[in-house]
Design a protein with these regions (language model features):
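Short beta-strand/loop motif that positions the catalytic acidic residue
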Residues: 193-196
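C-terminal catalytic histidine-bearing segment of alpha/beta-hydrolase fold enzymes
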Residues: 217-279
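An N-terminal hydrophobic leader/cap segment in hydrolases
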Residues: 4-56, 260-264, 268-279
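Loop/turn elements at helix/coil->beta-strand transitions in domains of secreted/extracellular proteins
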Residues: 63-66, 90-93, 145-147, 169-173, ...
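Serine-hydrolase catalytic machinery in alpha/beta-hydrolase-like enzymes
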Residues: 36-143
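Primarily recognizes the serine-hydrolase "nucleophile elbow" in alpha/beta-hydrolase
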Residues: 134-188
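Conserved alpha/beta-hydrolase "acid-adjacent" motif
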Residues: 201-207
Length: 279
């Protein structure tokens, strides 16, 4: 009997592995080198979409939800494939935007100024997002551009939160990975998930995070992790990326199309992730 159970378990593992591999191969990635003539600015985008859902959208039988990822400072927009794949597996049309260019002024911190002197950076990021949305409408008209999901890491998370604050009617979800400067949007019409690092070199500004009472009342999910700030990209160890993927998948979980495993806690979005081991 035990031998039979072992064989069955092995078969299930093989089938599961094939399904996971198949779903990842089924996600199409494409680089878009766009140019905003109004601002004379190039905007590079890494596009990700499930091939089967893309085909259904082209046939007019499916409308794709849209997610836009904003990169962290010094991290490339192509270094968030672990997030792109979760979102695409859930059926999203995903655009990972290169928010900064080598020609941009360096990111500085000016204590005492609004958003520590980075308002122009956030406005530029907001303009990039709106420009990409307009370009995506030409490429994939059968997508929902009225209820966007904005995702961002570090400075990109601040751009996502700032854009959501400026355009609450366009944004339905915000997912940030250790944004430090822009206070959270308070709206019962917007779902928010935020992963927080345990990195002494990256401290969140006062007033950015909601109080526990506000988070509970407004349904904001704060996930405290043992991870370093830079681990919240493809640069992070596999264990960290897997934990973030699983929690993100559960947050998105209106459908059951994703092959990602749920996190193994009773209330994963409120509980801490961890403890590891993590390198």
């Amino acid at each position: 009997m035990k031998r039979g159970l072992v064989i069955l378990a092995c078969i299930c593992a093989v089938i599961g592995g094939v399904y996971v591999a198949g779903s990842k191969w089924a996600i199409r990635h494409q680089t878009l080198d766009l140019f905003d003539a109004t601002r004379q600015r190039p905007v590079s985008v890494d596009l990700a979409v499930r091939r089967d859902y893309e085909m259904q959208a082209s046939e007019g039988t499916r409308t794709l939800p849209v997610a836009l990822i904003s990169n962290g400072n010094t991290v490339k927009n192509t270094e968030y494939s672990f997030l792109e794949n979760v979102l695409a597996a859930r059926g999203y049309l995903v655009a990972s935007i290169q928010q900064d260019l080598p020609s941009d002024p360096p990111l500085v911190t000016k204590v005492g100024m609004p958003y520590v002197g980075r308002l122009d950076v956030y406005k530029r990021g907001e303009a990039n997002i709106l420009f990409v949305v307009d370009e995506l409408k030409k490429i994939e008209p059968n997508a929902n551009y009225d209820h966007l999901t904005l995702v961002g890491h570090s400075n990109g998370g601040d751009i996502a939160m700032y854009t959501a604050k400026e355009h609450p009617g366009l944004v339905s979800k915000v997912i940030t990975l250790d944004n430090l400067r822009v206070p959270f949007v308070h709206s019962d019409k917007m779902k928010i998930l935020s992963f927080r690092s345990n990195d002494p070199n990256f401290k969140t500004d006062p007033g950015v995070l909601p109080t526990p009472e506000q988070a509970k009342a407004e349904g904001i999910d704060i996930v405290r992790t043992p991870f370093q700030h830079t681990w919240m990209s493809d640069r992070g160890p596999e264990e960290a990326r897997d934990e973030i993927q699983a929690t993100l998948d559960k947050f998105l979980g209106e459908s059951t199309n994703s092959d990602l495993s749920p996190v193994a806690t009773d209330n994963p979005l409120i509980a801490k992730i961890g403890p590891g081991p993590y390198p």
